Amino acid sequence: MTKEKLSPGMQQYLDIKKDYPDAFLLFRMGDFYELFYDDAIKAAQILEISLTSRNKNADNPIPMAGVPYHSAQQYIDVLIDLGYKVAIAEQMEDPKKAVGVVKREVVQVITPGTVVDSTKPDSANNFLVSLDTDGSQFGLSYMDLSTGEFYATTLADLPAVRSEVLNLKTRELVIGFELSENEDQLFRKQMNLLLSFEKTVYDDVHLLDDQLKAIELAAAGKLLQYVHNTQKRELSHLQKLVHYEIKDYLQMAYATKSSLDLLENARSGKKHGSLYWLLDETKTAMGTRLLRTWIDRPLVSSSLISKRQDIIQTFLDHFFERSDLSDSLKGVYDIERLASRVSFGKANPKDLLQLGQTLSQVPVIKTILESFASSSLESLINQIDTLPELEALIRSAIDSNAPITITEGGMIREGFDETLDKYRTVMREGTSWIADIETKERQKSGISTLKIDYNKKDGYYFHVTNSNLSLVPDYFFRKATLKNSERFGTAELAKIEGEMLEAREESANLEYDIFMRIRSQVESYIERLQNLAKSLATVDVLQSLAVVAENNHYVRPSFNHQQEISIENGRHAVVEKVMGSQEYIPNTINFDQKTSIQLITGPNMSGKSTYMRQLALTVIMAQLGSFVAADSADLPIFDAIFTRIGAADDLISGQSTFMVEMMEANHAIKAATPNSLILFDELGRGTATYDGMALAQAIIEYIHNKVGAKTLFATHYHELTDLSTRLTSLVNVHVATLEKDGEVTFLHKIADGPADKSYGIHVAKIAGLPKDLLNRADHILVDLEKMSAAVSVNLKNETKESQPVEEQLSLFAIDNNYEELIKKLKQLDLTNLTPRESMNALFDLKELL
């Protein structure tokens, strides 16, 4: 169908749609949002709704699908979750009063980064991120429209951008410059981001601080412009832009946070089994979000950490007061998101009631905090604004039984507005008057069944059956005739009805106006409400950390400037919690000033990785202000943590385990300082044995000689333990085992010195390999050990060879090649070999045959 043949309504649809080609256009028509053409076809498939057509008898019917306006949000949520944009076109005038086609406009574009309303409420932040560049560095800005938070920073390069974008759990990225092919590939394909583009800077002097760097202001200004383009309104809840520096927090790449299960369990993708899960005893949505932020960005300032610790200690010292505080916080709703709903003009009476209930709890919370009588809480108490005038307004204005909608009436409390009360009196008395008229006319007419009914079409009427029509008085006038009865009116009834309908209409209009005025008054308090939310969130997180510390017998860590680590009987806090009643075996970790590297050897499944993660989690917990899982802990303040734990292939970008290992190792040794913590687990296992060993040794030497960072390096290359003879800051430790009657028990305890065996066959036994296979492996191992020759590669790459033999012997003869073959076989860690490593090993062995 050509545009010339379209109806005015469809022409209007196409005119609007051309401005939003990348979004589903929900076009309001009466009680439905309609979709047309390709939008309808795609939406019908995705949303599982009926696909029909407009102008069905035409040569080219227009595909059409629709959803009811009152339940549209659930369908919008589905589209947004799948990464689509949705444009909402509303009717801007009453269709009954419209001349020609009803005026329609897009009032909002909802995108994955701009979700505010949702049928699936989630306490987590939803950050919309923008990126700009001046060619030498990147400006990154982000905001959460549901809370009003607004931040900006400068990043040196694309890897730093990638890490920060991942850390922010970004779904939508606003780009302010022309992307290169590599950048486009990174963001679209590898990171699976929805990209939106904005070249215009929105200059808002109230939100943007001109003291910030130009590149940050550019990113923030373009983000603001994009938000104004999509939301189509001024947003009073957006907070002033806050500059932050990555270096002001404990730096951790996204891969590090993932490998340590900080915010979610890397294997399940769920909260359970993460540090966040362990520490979350918060009672409010704001507290939950702030706890995630603290875990994501631990501090590097000992004074700020100490302030948090002091408050936690205060809470621990006052159990009953803390319990009262916890109970009071349960009555606090999500102030930040309630404020944003007010700003968006979407707050309903229930929202205001929740806000009022929250404000009624604030004085109680403040009084409880004052009862602790602690100087550590003074600053926090002073920041808590009780807003008594706002609480009084909501309490006096909003009816406690108010509905969710703002058009049904029943929102405003009796006694708040004199005129509204008069209208309500008329409606109540009108009902009584009608009852009196019914009784009077029944008696006068002698019609015993006479009654007054009401419907929208006929209004109020007397219902008279056919058998009583002869008794109808002359002053009754007919309103409707039915098969078995007729409906009548009277002048008196019509007068009362008119007064009641007028009162009802005026009451509804006035009540709506009053509610809008109240909501506007609430909007003027948004900044104070947001500040209150921050204070209550801080209280909530600190009480949560106190509860966790008490329940799990954690201790307050201390900090030193000597770069010494002393953790007495430390535990992996999350593993301990998951184990529940099982006994957790603690480990002591010590690094003096002279020690920078612990080289850890021991069998698989013995606890090397847990020991490494234990240290990292202890550091993170300590630096976010939490108490820690140990008998005692004295730590330096670390500036960064670098990890390579586990074989996390980067399958999206097609990079192998070994490539990822080398990239992460490269990043660590280049970015680490003497104040950093490095955790490398089995580095080098992704390539051939000697390649891996050589690289592992070279990396250890580089860290020792040039970086100086505190390092835990777990390895299955037992030859590396000899490094302690010439690297003065390296010490060997191992996971202890107990051998008895041919059985091996892993003690999960770290002991000094190197491990003497790998216990690979024992691990295979635990894994359930057949008994005859294991027995055969034992015999082969004994034979191989007996025939092993004295070929050794020392740490200076000097090789000692046995005396040459004149001719090639059989496989079981002891010649140079066989000795080398035996040595390589013994070095193979079969339980850890990947398919690629196995192929490399076979090629190496084949060369010796």
Swiss-Prot record:
Keyword S-adenosyl-L-methionine (UniProt): no
Record's keyword terms, sorted: ATP-binding, DNA damage, DNA repair, DNA-binding, Nucleotide-binding
InterPro entries: DNA_mismatch_repair_MutS, DNA_mismatch_repair_MutS-lik_N, DNA_mismatch_repair_MutS/MSH, DNA_mismatch_repair_MutS_C, DNA_mismatch_repair_MutS_clamp, DNA_mismatch_repair_MutS_core, DNA_mismatch_repair_MutS_N, DNA_mismatch_repair_MutS_sf
Residues given in the record as ATP binding sites: 602-609
GO annotation (BP), single: mismatch repair
Keyword hit for Nucleotide-binding: yes
CDD domains, per database record: ABC_MutS1
Any one GO molecular-function label of the UniProt entry: mismatched DNA binding
Highest taxon listed in the record's lineage: Bacteria
GO cellular component: cytosol
Family according to the record: Belongs to the DNA mismatch repair MutS family.
PANTHER family reported for this sequence: DNA MISMATCH REPAIR PROTEIN MSH1, MITOCHONDRIAL (PTHR11361:SF34), DNA MISMATCH REPAIR PROTEIN MUTS FAMILY MEMBER (PTHR11361)
Function as written in the Swiss-Prot or TrEMBL entry: This protein is involved in the repair of mismatches in DNA. It is possible that it carries out the mismatch recognition step. This protein has a weak ATPase activity.
Protein name (database record): DNA mismatch repair protein MutS
Naturally occurring in which organism (per UniProt): Streptococcus mutans serotype c (strain ATCC 700610 / UA159)
